[in-house]
Amino acid sequence: WSSDVCSSDLSSQVSQLRGQLEDSFLIVNLADSTKNIDVSIDLLLLVAPKELSVDTVFAIDQFLMGGGSVVIFSSPLDVTSQSVNISIIPHKSGLEDWLLHHGIEIKNELVSDMKNSSFPIPVDRKIGDYTIRETQLINYPFFIDVREDVLENSRDINQGLEQITVTWASPISIINQNKKSDHRFFLNSSKNSWSSDNFDIQPNFNKYPDIGFPTANEKALINLGVILDGNFLSYFREPPNQPDIDEN
């Protein structure tokens, strides 16, 4: 299940993911307007959901209540490009309150990691009185390089993976967790990481000559993925279009 409204780059990635999954699984597409999810579906995969309606969130909720498994790739932030510049914009999935109900908070911040992958990006360079813009392959702190030493901690989930690059990620945490469910984090950055609400993702080597971006004095491992398992309480007191949706 992916949003009908997504960038061409994301659409390409979703198509690649679908192609790989089709080698082993039967794939069923669901529209954003879906109000009922067949219980025969083994796994509901939500890729970059965007502005889901209350009816759709209710369908997801009831699928989970019926014992279904749900995997969500989501962030409160999105990346957009204009000309040669890239920037961060807000992203609303429609699942924010539903996730909080289950104790999952995705912070409105970006994670940076000194252990990162490279990224070709336009960089301004001064030559005498002139400034030129050229594309350089730089170590990009927002492209978090997760290696086998981290992945092996959750080998049942990450089996066969030796490396993952997690791009423009936000911190994920557990708050006010429902006591009937258990959680474990399965994906994290290195200990040389930090998060910030500074969303300038264009490097400035004139101001920050080391890596092109400001760093934090305090660095620590940051969680990027979590698994919840067990019994869940519905977010809804009643079906949509009726009063009193429980947002606690």
Language-model features: locations:
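Acidic, S/T/G-rich, low-cysteine, solvent-exposed domains in lumenal/extracellular/periplasmic regions
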Residues: 4-248
